[in-house]
């Protein structure tokens, strides 16, 4: 019985010079997605995907590592400069932006797009430890 040939789709290297780095920083994790200007993802990384578990995911160091790995794979596509959009109140906000700069990407703008409710849902009750 002959095996059917399966054609695998290869990843095409895009030539993108300008992009957008979306940093989603929550209290539990930090997710960094780098896209082109139209929103098509070039690379992404998160603290959990790098092997950090539990409360270590929410550290600034984990956010820095996630930002570095996402920027390195995006620079293989020819990325040179990024606009940064930051969403969320987490501890990894500033360290993720600094890691993008130290990786060799030029940060042209930093935009805070954290959603603010106009008195919407009731927030979770205070934690008592």
Swiss-Prot record:
The keyword Repeat does not apply. GO terms for biological process: translation. It holds the Pfam family Ribosomal_S11. Keywords: Ribonucleoprotein, Ribosomal protein, RNA-binding, rRNA-binding. InterPro entries: Ribosomal_uS11, Ribosomal_uS11_bac-type, Ribosomal_uS11_CS, Ribosomal_uS11_sf. It comes from the Bacteria. The keyword RNA-binding applies. One of its GO terms (cellular component) is ribosome. One of its GO terms (molecular function) is structural constituent of ribosome. Part of the 30S ribosomal subunit. Interacts with proteins S7 and S18. Binds to IF-3. NCBIfam families: PRK05309.1 (NF003698), uS11_bact (TIGR03632). Located on the platform of the 30S subunit, it bridges several disparate RNA helices of the 16S rRNA. Forms part of the Shine-Dalgarno cleft in the 70S ribosome. Belongs to the universal ribosomal protein uS11 family. This is Small ribosomal subunit protein uS11. The gene is rpsK.
